Amino acid sequence: STMSSIYYASAYSEIWGNPDLKPMSEYDINLMWQLNRKYTFTAFAMLEPDYFVQMAYQPADRMAVIMKETNFDYSNCFGLQASAQFRLGSWLNGNVNATALYRHDKTQFFDLPIDRTRLSGIVSGMAVVKFSQRHNIQLILNPFFQTKAIQGLYDIDPFLRLNATLRYTSKDGKWSLVAKGENILNGHISTSSTIARQDYTMRVWMPYTNYSLTAVYRIGNFKEKQKKEVDTSRMGY
């Protein structure tokens, strides 16, 4: 909020507005090289002057947590990413992405000067296992792992997420049975702030573990529209 107001969420938690909050800017630079149509290498930079985010602050003179959106001087990320496709016979194929990310956050938050850097790693991908060509049964795995990272005051613990899909399609292509599991390892993002006088921890569950079973019958010559997958390997969740 850009209002100069204070909302008391509880006896302990306060949400402060910030009338001095400014719009942020973002500049992206990418340099990509592809080898043999199987391997892709990318160097990138994300420069964000006046980046803003809501952070928590614990004052020294009273028991309270103040949540306030604040502008950084900048939040800059520089990284290298390598992507590869793989295939093992007719029963296994997929891709893997590995990213090395260097982040530098700088700002002044209340009486806390923040000038922090961190080198993090992200590994993600997709694996398709075909159990039976005759019966068209396949398992799709989508893992995501991020090492320790930072955001302003916060330290972000390593995070592992795994989604899985088991799909059966009839020989004529009309029937499909799809079983899905999202976040089946019940992963969560844990953040903590322990610099200076701060001692604050928060867990973010995104999303909760859930399972679904779907039966699909295609009428006539209907074909499912192919959707282009969004590259989320640098998003951090």
Regions found by a protein language model. Give the residues of each.
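Transmembrane beta-barrel strands of outer-membrane/channel proteins
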Residues: 27, 33, 41-47, 96-102, ...
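Residue-level signature of outer-membrane beta-barrel architecture
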Residues: 31-35, 45, 84-90, 100, ...
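Membrane-spanning beta-strand positions in outer-membrane beta-barrel proteins
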Residues: 30, 34, 38-42, 93, ...
